[in-house]
Amino acid sequence: MLAQAERFIESQGFHLMTKDEIPKFTRCAMESYGNIVYALDDYFVGHPCTKEELWEMWLFNLKYFYSRALIYSDSPDCNAWILWIPPGCKGVSMIDFIRYGGIRLTLKLGLTTMKRIMHYEDYSASVRLKATGNSEWYLYNLVVRPEAQGQHLAGKLLRPMLEYCAQSGKPAYLETHSEKNVEIYRHFGFEVVSNDPIPGTRVTHWGMVMPKKQEVNNVK
């Protein structure tokens, strides 16, 4: 399933991330955050998240998902990129956690932070399972460099895979913790299916689904 989606994305003119480009994609993600405060990251670390802590989290995610997810950018310059987890993907095993830098991540962020991340991942997975039955293409990340914003790159990256999901009869799913983002994704046809605080926090978790075979809104 992943290989078929990768062939489709390449046919649309997008650039698939290579293993050597993981640091480049991580830098793009870091730049996309800029000085924006994300409540979820602050919850993970228990204080305003530093750039060093954010770097470690992004780097681990991209190393882990490199061979498991669909990760592509607008071009080799990587002004924007997106990560989709294919249907049926399971959580991180202990062996893979260690293999892709989990010990380093724990040493850098601390055991308490790792417990918070696992608490969130368990909650997120339960919400997603209820919404889609684990049959979805899961939009895990979408980032755009600040200097590239306003060029409609987010829509450019999103639309082909939304069409792919519709044609293959699979729902598309995402989650966000920003009310502003909820309105943005509604323009693409996503519907809110959950809107609750993450247990034990004040961080609101929106789960959004684009139902099977729904026409993709042609917005920039």
Model-derived regions: residue spans:
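Conserved GNAT-fold acetyl-CoA-binding loop/helix
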Residues: I36-W58
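A short beta-loop-alpha structural element at the N-terminal edge
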Residues: Q12-N35
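A short helix-loop-beta-strand connector motif used in the catalytic cores of GNAT acetyltransferases and
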Residues: T50-S73, N79-A80, N134, Y138
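Conserved acyl-donor/pantetheine-binding loop and adjacent beta-alpha core of acyl/acetyltransferases
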Residues: W81-V143, Q149, P199
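Conserved GNAT acetyl-CoA-binding A-motif
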Residues: S135-W137, Y164-H177
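Conserved active-site alpha-helix within GNAT-family acetyltransferase domains
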Residues: Q167-G169, S178-N195, T201
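Conserved acetyl-CoA-binding loop-helix of GNAT-fold acetyltransferases
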Residues: V144, G150-E163
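Conserved beta-strand-loop-alpha-helix junction that forms the acyl-donor binding cleft
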Residues: Y140-Q149, Y173-V182, P199-V203, M210-K212
